[in-house]
From Swiss-Prot:
One of its GO terms (cellular component) is cytosol. Belongs to the shikimate kinase family. It is an enzyme of class 2 (transferase). Gene3D superfamilies: P-loop containing nucleotide triphosphate hydrolases (3.40.50.300). It catalyses: shikimate + ATP = 3-phosphoshikimate + ADP + H(+). It is found in: Cytoplasm. This is Shikimate kinase 2. The gene is aroK2. Pathway: Metabolic intermediate biosynthesis; chorismate biosynthesis; chorismate from D-erythrose 4-phosphate and phosphoenolpyruvate: step 5/7.
Length: 172
């Protein structure tokens, strides 16, 4: 199995955590598109948003997706990667896409527990629980339309990893 595996989902869904664990289990390299952009540009997400706006960030995000995609790699994408139909189509055509699904309350609790971990500028300026609920409601159908498989990411990371490995084994 030398496919590309993409992880999509909202902030705090576990894309990086599960993606790294899955890459280790498969002996694949792992890349997080947000970290890739930081390492290749020396700009944080917030820096790009301030200087280029969200449109500039989304453009860079799409470029990063295409640059890092190759056979036999696990890619954790930014939460908004699915906003572009081109990105959704690209991922579906070039690999297996897992949507890490979790209720807004779970995601908000994770963000509140680790306020500095991977934080991006607020999308709405509202309290985190409200923002997560609003963003998730707006993107849920996009995540599902991009995904080949939906994983319950509200459970422990080890359980999510087992779900992913079982699904990959079935499709091999």
């Amino acid at each position: 199995m030398t496919q590309t595996i993409f992880m999509v989902g909202a902030r705090a869904a576990g894309k990086t955590t599960i993606g790294q664990a899955l890459a280790n289990a498969l002996s694949y390299p792992f890349v997080d598109t947000d970290l890739y952009m930081l390492e290749t540009t020396n700009l944080t997400v917030a820096d790009v948003v301030v200087t280029e706006g969200w449109e500039g960030f989304r453009r860079r995000e799409s470029e990063a997706l295409r640059t890092v995609t190759k056979p036999g790699i696990v890619v954790a994408t930014g939460g908004g990667m699915v906003l572009s139909e081109e990105n959704r189509d690209f991922m579906r055509a070039n690999g297996t896409v897992f949507y890490l699904s979790a209720p807004a309350e779970v995601l908000a609790a994770r963000l509140e527990a680790y306020p500095d971990a991977g934080q991006r500028p607020t999308l709405t300026g509202r309290p985190i629980v409200e923002e997560v609920s609003e963003v998730l409601a707006a993107r849920e159908n996009l995540y599902r339309s991009a995904a080949h498989h939906v994983l319950d990411a509200s459970v422990a990371p080890e359980a999510v990893l087992v779900q992913a490995l079982e699904l990959l084994k079935k499709q091999a």
